[in-house]
């Protein structure tokens, strides 16, 4: 088989964001990262994914860290490599829709504090939910990596994703990311999809997958043959070293320094061992589980699902919940399982199993999704489930959900005037009004560390609420 591209394959390393989100419930601290940042910067990666996703919430909720300060610290030590973040479209980094002015301000502050590339996705692939974030990222000089949330269903096929990619390119995307959060993209399908995308759009293609089902390495290799431009690797993703060694001496040789990778790996193995000893990194998430191809559960959802069941004392229901997830997903119109739909579907599945009766209880987020408040669901919602949730057909939202929201930023500035010390604080408070106030109060009443190179003593919040 011949490579369809002769350009070196570019690599984004995810150790600073997705690796610990998917395997350790997002509990890696900035002190865990600091000793390796300059080594990571020297390896030659295209970019480092270091921020966004669940890290923002977890910094304040569990680690007692300011997420904005984390970003500034990483930027200070990573001078040569692009930094990128994961951004949930109109949900920003939260779990509901925010007004356009809040989305705009968050993009502005993310770029101002050090982000170069914003990977923007919508859990439902509703492009209306990406419009503002794409516009704002370009407005403030960032690069837009618009995302296809990959999944498998009667609706989601190759033609669907090719059409979506073309639409995103026309909206201004600088790159297109295939976000295979549950490791469902099989090797031959990856070859076919990447080839079709390269024939349809002119912007670079970036592939993000996992190794949950054991196919990740093969998927990346076949994508490399098909001409993919950039791939994600790391701890939760397929191993960087394996791919670099595989392509060495070929036309797609990455040119990355395996020796420096080894130095970084030694450090992060020690961090992983500490997290495992503390019971935070559960060995279950390190195993290959081919049942993923049935359950379609992404890595980040898996580790937090385990955490949620532990807290409820229902660990024995783990596989029952996994089996319930695809049933709920079908009833909800086949949403891809990525934040926030993964949390919504996952929590509904947990409730269905724990309560002993399906749909006895509907969390408010489930009702909001069934009502269309998150956007248009890809497929047909089970009308019996929607009716059981108390939603009449005429109540379903059909417009862009954010069009129903009035500007909010000035309201938040006034509301948090006495507490917020900066616009960054205002945004933290706007997104996480239950978590950010106590974090900011605690932050502002403890002494600053001498320097970011000296580990600070921080209080760890104990919060029984799972961020699934």
Model features per residue range: what roles?
Residues 1-4, 36-41, 70-77, 221-223:
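Short amphipathic alpha-helices and their capping/turn segments at secondary-structure boundaries
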Residues 35, 41-59, 282-292, 296-468:
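Terminal or standalone catalytic/regulatory effector modules within metabolic enzymes
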Residues 11, 19, 40, 120, ...:
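Conserved, mostly hydrophobic/aromatic
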Residues 181-360:
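Catalytic alpha/beta core domains of metabolic enzymes, predominantly
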Residues 44, 114-116, 140-142, 170-174, ...:
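Glycine-enriched alpha-helix->loop->beta-strand junction motifs that scaffold or abut catalytic
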Residues 52-169, 173-176, 182, 186:
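Active-site beta->alpha loop and helix N-cap motifs at the rims of alpha/beta catalytic domains
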Residues 38, 108, 135, 166, ...:
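Alpha-helical segments flanking ligand/cofactor-binding loops in enzyme cores
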Residues 1-24, 71, 76:
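N-terminal amphipathic alpha-helix/helix-capping segment at the start of soluble metabolic enzymes
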